[in-house]
């Protein structure tokens, strides 16, 4: 198998003017739009899409062609389980190439994605499953036992689960206003509440163009879980603009030393991190010498940095 094609990008950010951006920017929302087509299928097959590192140290390079084929295979599997346009697909998986492909597969079917972190407690997951009533729950062997004999159909996947499935799939032609994603609130004032987002919602995330200044082929890393907007949008947004996603599959919770080591070894240039993660990493006194970085841009959100 040929190796995915890497691209180099300049280290210095472009000079962006807020006033000029406001003057020149125009919202462009086509009538027909699908996240999977815009984020995944438009890229050249040979181009590098993701570098995934497991906490064991294993590293995988994944091309766009591999993600395109894998998402089509998953779409065929979901279709065989009765998933149709407008249905909901729940996903409880760690951040892996297979997980991203399952996201795209869901959107190619015209279904709604409900992604939940493997770090969620059982009660939180049960509430979301009960409230969303998904057609299928997708998980892995490490988490399957958490769901027992739940009424929802369960699909357990791994790296080899769709080897013999066809990679040909005709994606549904969706409207930009068709529902695509179901996010849940944090539940600070009662039970978490579901909020439906249409396919067009990703077009609103222009921060990756104007704040992160994403350049084609740039090494990007987002630290958020792929279960909330601040985790999934930093996956999809940079990909739309041609970045290479560097994904770290943690063992358990956030470890600032392991995170800084990952960023340093892979020479990540563009990062989205929560204020909590930034404070945790800054608490390491000798971080600059132990973990030299190549950051071009680091962005954060959610609360003030201090």
Identify the role of each PLM range.
Residues 50-104, 121-126, 200:
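Conserved AMP-binding/adenylate-forming core of the ANL superfamily
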Residues 46-48, 166-184, 191, 198, ...:
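Conserved pre-ATP/AMP-binding loop-to-beta segment of ANL
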Residues 203-222, 227-269, 279, 283-284:
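Conserved AMP-binding/adenylation subdomain of ANL enzymes
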Residues 1-62, 66-79, 142, 151:
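N-lobe entry segment of adenylate-forming
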Residues 80, 101-165, 169-172:
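Structural core segment of the AMP-binding/adenylate-forming
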Residues 60-65, 180-204:
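Conserved AMP-binding A3 loop
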Residues 94, 139-147, 250-252, 268-306:
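Adenylate-forming
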Residues 93-94, 102, 111-130, 141-144, ...:
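ATP-dependent adenylate-forming carboxylate-activation enzymes
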């Amino acid at each position: 198998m040929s190796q995915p094609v890497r691209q180099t990008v300049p280290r210095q950010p472009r000079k962006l003017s807020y006033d000029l951006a406001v003057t020149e920017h125009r919202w462009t929302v086509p009538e027909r739009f699908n996240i999977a087509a815009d984020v995944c299928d438009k890229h050249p097959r040979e181009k590098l899409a993701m570098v995934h590192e497991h906490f064991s140290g294993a590293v995988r390079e994944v091309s766009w062609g591999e993600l395109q084929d894998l998402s089509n295979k998953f779409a065929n599997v979901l279709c065989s389980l009765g998933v149709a346009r407008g249905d909901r697909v729940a996903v409880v998986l760690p951040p892996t190439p297979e997980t991203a492909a399952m996201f795209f597969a869901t959107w190619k079917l015209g279904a709604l994605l409900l992604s939940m972190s493997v770090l969620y407690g059982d009660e939180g997951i049960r509430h979301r499953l009960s409230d969303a009533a998904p057609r299928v729950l997708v998980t892995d062997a490490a988490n399957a036992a958490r769901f027992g004999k739940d009424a929802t159909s369960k699909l357990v996947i791994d790296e080899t689960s769709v080897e013999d499935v066809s990679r040909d799939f005709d994606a549904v032609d969706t409207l930009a206003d068709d529902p695509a994603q179901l996010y849940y609130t944090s539940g600070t004032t009662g039970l978490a509440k579901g909020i439906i987002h249409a396919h067009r919602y990703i077009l609103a995330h222009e921060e990756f163009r104007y704040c992160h200044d994403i350049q084609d082929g740039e090494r990007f890393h987002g630290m958020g879980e792929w279960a909330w907007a601040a985790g999934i949008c930093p996956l999809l947004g940079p990909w739309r603009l041609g970045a290479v996603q560097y994904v770290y599959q943690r063992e358990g919770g956030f470890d600032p030393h392991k995170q800084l080591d990952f960023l340093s070894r892979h020479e990540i240039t563009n990062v989205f991190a929560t204020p909590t993660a930034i404070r945790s990493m800054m608490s390491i006194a000798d971080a600059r010498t132990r973990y030299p970085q190549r950051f071009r841009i680091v962005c954060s959100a959610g609360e003030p940095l201090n």
